[in-house]
Regions:
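Cross-family detector of peptidyl-prolyl cis-trans isomerase
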Residues: 5-163
Length: 163
C-alpha cells in the first residue's frame, strides 16, 4: 500500500496512561499474590513455621546467636546456601567461600539486609526472599532467573563494628 504526500501513515491508537497504569498495578498485584501463594505452599510442604515481615520476607531463626544483633554499617561475614523454591541449587559458601558485607551498605539483596538485622553472631536462619527483595525482574543473569523467589540458609560467622 502506498502513501501520498497528503496521506500520512495511520496513527497508532492512543494509550490512556491512567488505564495503562491501573492495568500494570492489577497485573503486579496478581503476580505478587501468586508468588505469596507459592511461598505458602513451600513452607506448608516442609512444615516450616516462618515469621513474615511487612515487606514479605519470611524468616525462621534456627539457632539464636550471641551478643547484639547486626546493625546498619556493621561488617557481617556469613556462610550461606541459596536455592530456588523448586529446590534448584544456585550458590553456596561451600564452593564460593563466605561472604562479607556491610549491613545496609553493600549491593546485595535488600531482603538479606533486612533479615540479617534479626541475627547476631553464631545465629542460623532460613530466609525466603520474594523476587522484589531478591534479584527482581532480571534475576542475577546467571543462575537465578527473572522474578524468582530465593531461599537462603544463612549462618552469621562474624559480626563487627566498622571504625
Amino acid at each position: 500500500m502506498g502513501y501520498s504526500c497528503r496521506n500520512s501513515e495511520p496513527e497508532a491508537p492512543k494509550i490512556d496512561e491512567e488505564q495503562l497504569k491501573e492495568s500494570l498495578i492489577r497485573v503486579n498485584k496478581t503476580l505478587a499474590h501468586e508468588e505469596n501463594l507459592a511461598i505458602d505452599r513451600y513452607t506448608e510442604r516442609r512444615g516450616l513455621k516462618m515469621e513474615r515481615t511487612g515487606t514479605g520476607l519470611r524468616y525462621l531463626i534456627l539457632k539464636e546467636g550471641q551478643g547484639s544483633k547486626a546493625l546498619p554499617g556493621m561488617s557481617v561475614t556469613v556462610n550461606y546456601r541459596i536455592e530456588l523454591l523448586d529446590g534448584t541449587f544456585c550458590y553456596s559458601s561451600d564452593s564460593l567461600g563466605s561472604k562479607t558485607f556491610e549491613v545496609d551498605q553493600d549491593q546485595i539483596e535488600s531482603g538479606i539486609h533486612e533479615g540479617i538485622k534479626l541475627l547476631s553472631k553464631g545465629a542460623k536462619a532460613k530466609f525466603i526472599l520474594p523476587s522484589h527483595l531478591a534479584h527482581g525482574l532480571l534475576g542475577d543473569e546467571d543462575k537465578i532467573p527473572a522474578k524468582s523467589t530465593v531461599v537462603y540458609d544463612i549462618e552469621v560467622i562474624e559480626l563487627t563494628n566498622n571504625p
